[in-house]
Amino acid sequence: MRALLTAISAPGSSAVYCTVGDLDWWRYNDEPEAIALAHLWFTGDLLIGVAWPKNDQVDLLTHPHHRDIEASMVSWAERARRARAGAGGEALPLRAWTYDGDVPRTALLQAHGYARTATHFRYHSRPLDTPIPALPVPPGYTLRPVTGTADIEPRVAVHRAAFAPSRMSAARYHRLMGAPTYRADLDLIVVAPDSAFAAFCIVWFDAANRLGVFEPVGTHPAHRRRGLGQAILYEGLRRLRQLGARTAYVNSYGGDEAAERLYTSVGFQLVDRNYAWEKLL
């Protein structure tokens, strides 16, 4: 699956549905058995497609040279949705995702009876071809990477505060730290004067494609509007550039204008919008 995502994210690709870093965040931030629901498509020994269902939605990941399998993937996702629901007869919603700029998938979903909802994510990109400015944190705060398992409890606490309600737990975070793409030097935190964690981000580095993804990014409500988000993003961008990355990506939830302002303030530009399309089965 990682080889497929490397091909999907290759230089010259348009907006990307999932990088190797996204895969690690999705997989290790979920229940361990969730990946077992994914269905795979091969041509010979080459993996060319993955449909990963969860609840009432499905993520479709397709090799750029084999987009013709997506109709089969959608049909499978609909059958799997019905099978998971069991007998009952009620209408079942199923959501699939497509970028505005992904004309083939948009046309496919329309042909299968899907309609675009208002739910979407904004996909942002930033080149790393110029030096990254430094932005110091306010006096009394410090910015550093996590230092191992001793940081798990406060790291979980700030995540839960920033994204309440949240399923994040110490067990989940410990599992996340074992993900293949996870690097402690790219798991950044801002520590407040009282030693509590105030802001955080994880940067996932795809060395093959020289790109980085920020997921997640957050600030404790008690420490917002102090420039901590900008400072930690700039530090993540700086570290990516030192590793040889050429591009950084980040997503924000549609309608989250505070996140939009934050990301554009450090040089990210909106590339596309990834909409949920829904069908009642």
Language-model segments: what does each one mean?
Residues 1-23, 134-168, 196:
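Short amphipathic alpha-helix that is part of the acyltransferase structural core
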Residues 5-87, 95-98, 193, 198-211, ...:
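Conserved donor-binding loop and adjoining core beta-sheet/short helix segment
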Residues 47, 54-139, 275-279:
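Acyl-donor-binding surface of acyltransferase catalytic domains
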Residues 67-83, 219-221, 225-242, 247, ...:
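Conserved acetyl-CoA-binding loop-helix of GNAT-fold acetyltransferases
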Residues 94-97, 214, 248-252:
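Conserved hydrophobic beta-strand within the GNAT/NAT acetyltransferase core sheet
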Residues 105, 109, 263, 268:
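Conserved active-site tyrosine of GNAT-family acetyltransferases
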Residues 162-208, 217, 221, 230:
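Phosphate-binding active sites in nucleotide-utilizing proteins
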Residues 173, 233, 256-259, 278-281:
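Short glycine/proline-centered loop/turn elements that form peptide/ligand docking sites
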